[in-house]
Every structure is written in structure tokens, then in C-alpha cells.
Amino acid sequence: MSSQLNDPTPIPAQSSLSFTQGFFLLGQLSVVLLIAAFIKFFIFGEAPPPPSRGLSHRSATHRRSNSIFSSAQHDGSTRTLREKPSNSNVLRPVPSSATNTRSILRKTYYTAIPTNPSSKHGRHRIHHSSHQPESLDWFNVLIAQTIAQYRQTAYLLKDSPTSSILNSLTAALNNPEKKPSFIDKITVTDISLGEEFPIFSNCRIIAVDDPNSDGGRLQALMDVDLSDDNLSIAVETQLLLNYPKPCSAILPVALSISVVRFSGTLCISLVPASTPPLDTPSHSPSPPTAQTTTAGRSKREDQTSGSHSHAGGSSKEPSGENPPKTSPKSNVAFSFLPDYRLDLSVRSLIGSRSRLQDVPKVAQLVEARVHAWFEERVVEPRVQVVGLPDLWPRMGRTGVRTGDDSETGSNVPRSSTAADASGSARHEDSSREPEVLRFGSLLGTRPPFDLASRTSSFNVETGDLRSRSMTREESNGNLSDQFHMPGSLPGSGVATT
């Protein structure tokens, strides 16, 4: 009994770590596991594929397919990171399958099926598209804004001695190399740039077989329609009879040409920089003139003197002899199909005392000449090639769009001269009403037409400025349309009857 009381009871062994210490260690272990998982799956893991830009229910035909050159490009990128590239191997070549017509149509989800494979009259075979024709309402708005800006700019520069459209047309019409000797100086008496805008519609993309490009080339066809009675030009000149002696007889002639309606199919295509230039057939080479002969003789003399000086050892390198070479640029070519429609209204007035009005034969000759001029320039197979501008962002062309409500810090440091100029120009624009660009030159008084027709007549009379806008007045019981141009010089006016 006593021995049992003397035996000590065994004490259970206590843990060396408390609950708090164990919880802290467990938290550290979990943080280490999270960091390891983050490093493994987020830093060293593969990049996820880029999200699709299209809708989730896009059909299988509109899904992008992996390029067959993806693996080759991936290997090339890995190799260029390890190896030092040479100067001639920096720019990677573009695969031909990525720039041909089929690849472009596939990547832009446009279907072009050859439904008309037969060729006609030796022309390129056209592959018509099964894609539905598209409307061009947005394009019409942009074109209308551009034309409106051109009209306003031409009106504001009407008094400029160098940039005026009147001076440009006068110089073009009086070109001595093209104007016959029996026609006196041609004077432009009236110009109207119109009020309406062309309407483009029914745009479609076709594939055309072209031997100069791999896989052919793409061409945009769109219908264009313009109906504007105010698109006109009026000129005056004199026919000279040089037999039996020069200027033995003079016959005054006045013409007014208006474009009533134009409709046709516009073709637009891109011409790459590597494509050889298009050859446009010309009728006959221009005969050598005195200026060209003198220029050729002086050039030969310069070459001869340069060779002698080079032989003597005292020659210098000519500066600026060769024109600077520019890099080839991509061009856009546009033309009209031969099935266009151009309706003109030609009015004529021939004679000084006993006048002949609206002679049908004169109208036919003028219309035939205008059609020939148009077909020689922009009707298939002739095209107009225009160089595309440089679209690379440059600081010299950087501007800031200013607003009326808020002023940004970048547009604050403007000169007071520019602000005053813009304010005065804005004040002039608000005080004017340039509905139609119509102005005349300062010439002598001509007897008016004995017709009460539309505003396309072109007689010029001297008078004072009576109103701020173009108005019509009736005086002396006769119907006389007196046009006054706001901002024109005193003593000028355009009168029509």
C-alpha cells in the first residue's frame, strides 16, 4: 500500500512547439508553395493564345488559320536572339503566299469566285466576286467634304496671282504648243465649280489576272453618278483669218460648257512600287521647238566643255547636275469603264453684229472634243496613276485638334499673329456666302444673250458692287441676272441673261 503511494505517476511529454508557432510555420509553408506555383505557371509557363477579335458564333470559314510559316518564323526569331544578325539580313523577307490575292481575300473574309473565266478582246480575265455589293455612304460623306474644301479654297484664292484657278485655266487653255494659230487668246469669263456632289454606290472587289504580280491583282469597282447643272465654264476668243494676210478677218466666239450629268463605273487598283510603269500610248511626238533645240545645244556644249576640263585635270564635280533619286512609292491607279455617260450642255454665240446663237454644229464639235479629251486620259485601257502620300508619323506634320470648350497645354503656345489671322479668316468666311464659285474677269462690255435661261451665261460687264451676296436684279424692263461676288474688286461683276 505504501509502495504504491511512493511510486511517482508518469508525466506525459509536452510538444516543443506551441500552437502559435505551428500555425506560423504552416503559413510560411503555404506562402512558399504559392510563390513556387506562381513562378512555375505564370513566369515560366507558356503564353496564352491571343483572344479572338470576332464573335463567339463566327463560322468556321471566318476563323483564322495558322500560317504555315509560323514555325519557321518562330525558329528564325529564336535564332536571331542568339546569333548576331548581319546588316544585309536585318529585314526578313515577306513570303509570297502572304501577299498574293488569295491570301488577302482569305484574311479579310472576302469571297471572290471566278464566275466569268473567259477573256474577251485580249483583256485580262476578271474574276467577279460573290460578295454582296456594299454601300458607300461613309465614302460619299468624305468625298463631299473634300470637294467642299476644294471649292472653298478655290474661292478664297480667287484673287491670288499665282494660286488662282482662273490663272491656271487661262494658262492651260493658252498653251502655245497645243493652241492652233488661228485662235486668238482664250479668256475665261465664268467658272462654276458646282453645288452637288458625286454619289458612289455598288462597290465590289474583283480579282484580275495580271502577269506583273503574283496571283493577280485586286480591283475595286464602284458606280458613280453626278447631276449638277452648275458645273460649267465659259470662255471667249476670236477666230483669226490669216489669208491672204495675217489677221485679215476676226470672228468673235463665245462658248459655255456645262456638265449636266455624268455616270459610269470607276475602277481603282493599287500599283506596287516594284511594278514597271504603265505605258500610255501617245498620238505623235511633239515637234522640236526653239526652246528644246536651244536646251539640247547648250547641254551638248556643257558636256563638251566638261570633257575638256576633265582632260585638263582642272574639272570639278558638278553639284546638282543629276536630280536626287527618290525611293519608289506605291501608286493608286483609277480609270473609268468605256460604258460611261457624259451629258454636256453647250451654248455658243458667234459673230459681233449679226450673231448666231447655239449653233448645233459647234455644240457637236465641242462635245466630241471633250469626250476625246476625257477618253485619252481616264477611260480604259488608259489610267491615271497617283502616288500615295507618306503616311509615316512625323513631328513636322503633327497638329493639335483645338476645341472651343477646353484648352490643352500643347495648343496654348500659339503666336498672336496666327490667332489674329485665323480670327480674321473666320470673320471673312462668316460674312461671305459662297454658295457657288462664280466669278468673272475684268473685260469690256459684251452684248448679252437674248435668252432668259439658267445661270450659266458668261457675259462680263463692268459695274459697282451692290450687295454682299449673289443676287439677281431686274432693270429697264428686261430680265437681267446680275451676279455680284462678295469680296471682289470694285468694278467687276458677272451679268447673265
Curated annotation (Swiss-Prot):
Keywords: Endoplasmic reticulum, Lipid transport, Lipid-binding, Membrane, Transmembrane, Transmembrane helix, Transport
InterPro entries associated with the record: Mmm1, MMM1_dom, SMP_LBD
Lumenal-side segments: 1-22
Biased composition (Basic and acidic residues): 76-85, 425-435, 463-475
CDD domains: SMP_Mmm1
Compartments it resides in: Endoplasmic reticulum membrane
Main location group: endoplasmic reticulum
Domain SMP-LTD: 132-389
Bias-annotated ranges (Pro residues): 277-288
Start-end of Low complexity biased regions: 305-315
Membrane topology designation: Single-pass type I membrane protein
Biological processes per GO annotation: mitochondrial genome maintenance; mitochondrion-endoplasmic reticulum membrane tethering; phospholipid transport; protein insertion into mitochondrial outer membrane
Domain of life: Eukaryota
Cellular component, GO annotation: endoplasmic reticulum membrane; ERMES complex
Molecular function via GO: lipid binding
Cytoplasmic side: 45-497
Transmembrane segments: 23-44
Family per similarity comment: Belongs to the MMM1 family.
HAMAP family listed in its UniProt record: Mmm1 (MF_03103)
Subunit structure: Homodimer. Component of the ER-mitochondria encounter structure (ERMES) or MDM complex, composed of mmm1, mdm10, mdm12 and mdm34. A mmm1 homodimer associates with one molecule of mdm12 on each side in a pairwise head-to-tail manner, and the SMP-LTD domains of mmm1 and mdm12 generate a continuous hydrophobic tunnel for phospholipid trafficking.
Domain notes: The SMP-LTD domain is a barrel-like domain that can bind various types of glycerophospholipids in its interior and mediate their transfer between two adjacent bilayers.
Reported function: Component of the ERMES/MDM complex, which serves as a molecular tether to connect the endoplasmic reticulum (ER) and mitochondria. Components of this complex are involved in the control of mitochondrial shape and protein biogenesis, and function in nonvesicular lipid trafficking between the ER and mitochondria. The mdm12-mmm1 subcomplex functions in the major beta-barrel assembly pathway that is responsible for biogenesis of all outer membrane beta-barrel proteins, and acts in a late step after the SAM complex.
Protein name according to UniProt: Maintenance of mitochondrial morphology protein 1
